[in-house]
Regions:
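Positively charged n-region of N-terminal signal peptides that target proteins for export
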Residues: 1-7
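M16 family metallopeptidases and their MPP-like homologs
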Residues: 31, 36-62, 68, 76-123, ...
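A short, acidic, amphipathic alpha-helical segment used as a generic capping/interface helix at domain edges
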Residues: 433-442, 446
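Sec/Tat signal peptide C-region and signal peptidase I cleavage site
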Residues: 18-25
Length: 519
């Protein structure tokens, strides 16, 4: 009876209020591909985790997951899996700070069979207590345990955003906080879905081989969604006075994961972004070995697995080789990602006779080297040769961003978010007409190294010695085994000495217990 009553209320909401106020129709973006075998539907709502109610951090994520991981009024989640298996269809939801996107992919021959599933999930989701309890438990486990244990790299990135956006609705992870997730009830989810996912904050995307009648039916059915009363606030990232460092101390960390960043006032909506793409690619293109950071830290000194730079949020950098759509943001920042470097305890065990007295590991040296490289390129600019080579690479590389219909459609939806028609086409044209002066001017305008936030996730044995070195700007010589040191080129030895004494504008250092994060 309780669920039947809820479905009646939700259905009434989805049919829309009996009022004279017109609701904005959802924008429709189509990418017709007559030779494609697959159909892709993306429903992007302009509400993300930043729209989570205060005290309910994680509600947007949990709601979206309950839609796609639950059932409909006619079919349970288990029945849906059995129904869809022969179709090889799939669907999922992603939530970022400002948007939530539902993606449906299926073969064109199954349009008639699959569409009732899509319609049922979006218009009459079952929202059962059983599904809610299961998904809430998984989400809480991630916030309380998984993020701290599975990847110190992701941990450091989310902790940096906690610093950058502290006090704003961007601060918490998309999955929320421990207290926020614990407080969410099934009633919260039902109410939030009925008020936050509306036709007036929706962009409908279709790609592939589908009849015009399908597009019309989809648009007509989604008009039954109510008008949204939830708006996502757009914060401004804080600019610190100096370099603020937060060191997260955790037991049994095998290295120091470093992530640093500062706000920038440019996004894909701005033409300056293309110029920064060239500078960023030269400094540290994601998962590419030719970047300056990678060359200096990994290739030359074998300090870690890789080092990269960014001019916008990069989703799941540990697994994605190329940028993915679905994470557009208005509040932006530049960042440096240094994959974990060795701590003193590990180096002492590895080289007891040579480094037995070592007090701190490689993190201070790596941070200094990375910041110094950014500092140098801002001051000195790119050379003509580096500019031409990097721009040529990027004009080819961005064409790989949309290698599937789903990605192509996703980038088209993101383009609308930024006020553009087709960003992938726009950026190629922008790169084509860029000059070296454009790039060097953009770096001087948007990049600097005097004010930034730094997050380091490290072992509890390393945290305080590391904090002391950074707070006091103590020189941090690179630590090599004797056999490695003996074979170093003279130019590397000379550069090491300069890096070890490079002054960071550190004005604040805090050590935080891992149990006190994301509460």
């Amino acid at each position: 009876m309780r669920y039947t009553f809820f479905r009646f209320l939700l259905a009434a909401a989805l049919l829309g209020p009996v009022a004279t106020t017109a609701t904005r129709a959802a924008e429709v973006v189509e990418l017709r591909q007559p030779n494609a075998a697959k159909v892709v539907v993306k429903l992007q709502f302009r509400n993300g985790s930043a729209a989570d109610p205060v005290g309910k951090e994680g509600l947007t994520y949990l709601t979206s997951q309950l839609v796609t991981e639950g059932g409909t009024k006619d079919l349970t989640s288990a029945q849906l899996k059995d129904l869809l298996y022969p179709m090889a269809a799939r669907y999922y939801a992603t939530t970022d700070k400002e948007v939530t996107t539902f993606t449906f992919e299926f073969h064109k021959d199954f349009i008639d069979k699959f569409y009732p599933v899509l319609r049922g999930l979006m218009l009459t989701p079952s929202f059962t207590q059983e599904d809610f309890d299961r998904l809430k438990s998984n989400q809480l486990n991630y916030v309380e345990q998984v993020i701290r244990a599975s990847s110190d790299e992701d941990y450091s990135k989310f902790a940096l955003e906690d610093q950058l956006f502290r006090g704003s609705r961007y601060q918490h992870m998309t999955r929320g906080t421990a207290a926020g997730v614990k407080s969410i009830t099934l009633a919260d989810v039902k109410q939030y879905y009925a008020t936050a996912f509306g036709t007036d904050n929706l962009t409908i995307g279709l790609a592939g081989n589908y009849p015009a009648s399908f597009a019309k039916q989809l648009e007509a059915d989604l008009k039954k969604l109510p008008k949204s009363s939830v708006k996502t606030p757009i914060p401004v990232a804080a600019m610190p006075n100096g370099i603020h460092v937060e060191i997260i101390s955790k037991p049994d960390a095998l290295g120091s994961a470093v992530y640093a960043g500062f706000p920038i006032k440019t996004t894909r909506a701005d033409d300056d972004f293309a110029a920064l793409m060239v500078a960023n690619s030269w400094l540290g293109e994601h998962r590419k070995s030719y970047g300056k950071l990678y060359d200096k830290i990994r290739t030359t000194r074998s300090m870690n697995y890789g080092d990269y730079s960014y001019i916008e949020w990069y989703e799941a950098g540990g697994s994605n080789m190329l940028p993915v759509p679905g994470v557009p943001r208005h509040a932006n920042y530049a960042s440096l990602w240094l994959r974990p470097v060795q701590i003193a305890e590990g180096l002492r065990k590895q080289y007891p006779s040579e480094l037995g007295d070592l007090k701190v590991g490689h993190a201070p040296f790596a941070l200094r080297l990375a910041v110094r490289e950014m500092d140098n390129v801002v001051k000195n600019g790119l050379s003509k040769e580096d500019f031409e080579r990097t721009r040529t690479f990027l004009r080819s590389y961005v064409k790989l961003y949309g290698t599937t219909p789903a990605k192509q459609l996703g980038f088209l939806l993101d383009s609308r978010f930024y006020g553009r028609k087709n960003w992938l086409q726009d950026v190629d044209a922008q790169l084509a007409k860029l000059t070296l002066d454009d790039v060097n001017r953009a770096m001087r305008k948007h990049w600097q190294v005097q004010n930034m936030f730094v997050t380091i996730v490290t072992d509890d044995s390393e945290a305080q010695p590391l904090a002391d070195v950074l707070k006091n700007n103590t020189p941090s010589p690179m630590s090599y085994a004797n056999v490695v040191k003996a074979g170093l080129p003279k130019e590397v030895v000379a550069e090491d000495a300069e890096v070890a004494n490079y002054k960071l504008n550190v004005t604040e250092v805090k050590v935080i217990n891992t149990n006190d994060t994301f509460r």
